[in-house]
């Protein structure tokens, strides 16, 4: 492992602390809890939506979450190892055949639905 990769791994470990980031993929519905600072007040804001893209670049990894808010599509990019992220919870797994789901931007209603990934019996037993 070269020096830069080693430093990056140490930085990721330091950024995570005791937090754990669950495995998630494009198509999954996630709830991202974000620490928001407004003046002197700190609060946690939940952002729920579908992961439409994931960018794995070590410390610079990020993912885009899309949701429909008041009939308008809203996308937000999150840095995976940001200290502003309180937690990530996977609500449901989506079954998609693409790595980037940008085509969902052009769709609305039923055509924007994503099938749920069914977990096989063998895999469900190993996860429990």
Curated annotation (Swiss-Prot):
Listed GO CC annotations: cytosolic large ribosomal subunit
GO MF terms, alphabetically ordered: structural constituent of ribosome
Transmembrane portions of the chain: none
Keyword Ribonucleoprotein belongs to the record: yes
Pfam families, A to Z: Ribosomal_L19
InterPro entries, sorted: Ribosomal_bL19, Ribosomal_bL19_CS, Ribosomal_bL19_sf, Translation_prot_SH3-like_sf
Biological process, per Gene Ontology: translation
Record's keyword terms, sorted: Ribonucleoprotein, Ribosomal protein
Role, per record: This protein is located at the 30S-50S ribosomal subunit interface and may play a role in the structure and function of the aminoacyl-tRNA binding site.
Family: Belongs to the bacterial ribosomal protein bL19 family.
Name of this chain's protein: Large ribosomal subunit protein bL19
Species name: Paraburkholderia xenovorans (strain LB400)
């Amino acid at each position: 492992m070269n020096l830069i990769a080693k430093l990056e791994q140490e930085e990721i470990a330091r950024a995570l602390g005791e937090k754990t980031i669950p495995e998630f993929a494009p198509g999954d519905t996630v709830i991202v809890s974000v620490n928001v600072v407004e003046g002197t007040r700190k609060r946690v804001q939940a952002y729920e939506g579908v992961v439409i893209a994931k960018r794995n670049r070590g410390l610079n990894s990020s993912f885009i979450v899309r949701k429909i808010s008041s009939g308008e599509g809203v996308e937000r990019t999150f840095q995976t190892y940001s200290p502003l992220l309180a937690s990530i919870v996977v609500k449901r797994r989506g079954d998609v055949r693409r790595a980037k789901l940008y085509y969902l931007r052009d769709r609305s209603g039923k055509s924007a639905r994503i099938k749920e990934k069914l977990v096989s019996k063998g895999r469900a037993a190993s996860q429990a």
